[in-house]
């Protein structure tokens, strides 16, 4: 089992991270590990989460990374209530595995074209490092896999695996 200090250490070693802290927060009736990261250069939360999963394994336990300007602290430790509110308010996207074959196929295509090991169904295409070139490659792969046309506007407005899978169903 990976510990919170191990997650913090891996995040802190990332070249784009100035400081990182981790905590367990309660969300939808379960405990989830969330990290807060102050950045020295721009990198998205999903990319940092993927970095941790690459270093510590898929079962690292890290559900999400909140990008902060200044580390939220309370009584000398990371402010767990602040992190929990960020998750509740949707400012921190939590990793969620694909739930059916369509989502799994779309996530696998994104993973291959974006060179991201784990793509969650709520991850944003642009936050994963997507650009116009990768969009065209993904669109071509999806058209081939699902045997249906998909235009750029349709793809970009979907923005996540889950929403794109809904369009493809």
PLM regions with names:
Residues 18-19, 28-32, 56-78, 134, ...:
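AMP-binding/adenylate-forming catalytic domain of the ANL superfamily
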Residues 1-2, 69-123:
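Acidic/polar alpha-helix N-cap and adjacent early helical turns
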Residues 1-2, 166-169:
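Actinobacteria-biased recognition of intrinsically disordered, low-complexity terminal regions
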Residues 129-130, 142, 164:
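Short, compositionally simple motifs enriched in small residues
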Residues 1-10, 57-64, 92-96, 124-127, ...:
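Adenylate-forming
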Residues 16-24, 28-30, 107-128, 134-135, ...:
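Phosphopantetheine carrier-protein modules
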Residues 1-58, 109, 140:
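AMP-binding/adenylate-forming catalytic core of the ANL superfamily
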Residues 1-2, 43, 101, 133, ...:
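A generic structural signal for alpha-helix starts
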């Amino acid at each position: 089992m990976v510990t919170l200090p191990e997650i913090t250490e891996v995040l802190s070693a990332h070249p784009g991270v100035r400081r990182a802290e981790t905590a367990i927060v309660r969300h939808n009736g379960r405990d989830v590990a969330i990290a807060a990261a102050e950045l020295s250069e721009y990198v998205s939360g999903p990319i940092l989460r993927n970095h941790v999963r690459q270093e510590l394994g898929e079962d690292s336990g890290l559900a999400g990374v909140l990008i902060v300007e200044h580390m939220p602290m309370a009584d000398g430790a990371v402010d767990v209530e602040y992190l929990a509110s960020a998750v509740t308010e949707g400012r921190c996207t939590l990793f969620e595995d694909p739930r059916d074959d369509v989502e799994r196929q779309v996530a696998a295509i994104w993973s291959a074209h974006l060179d991201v090991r784990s793509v969650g169904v709520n991850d944003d295409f642009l936050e994963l490092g997507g650009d116009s070139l990768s969009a065209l490659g993904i669109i071509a792969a999806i058209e081939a896999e699902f045997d249906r046309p998909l235009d750029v506007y349709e793809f970009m407005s979907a923005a996540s695996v889950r929403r794109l899978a809904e369009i493809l169903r």
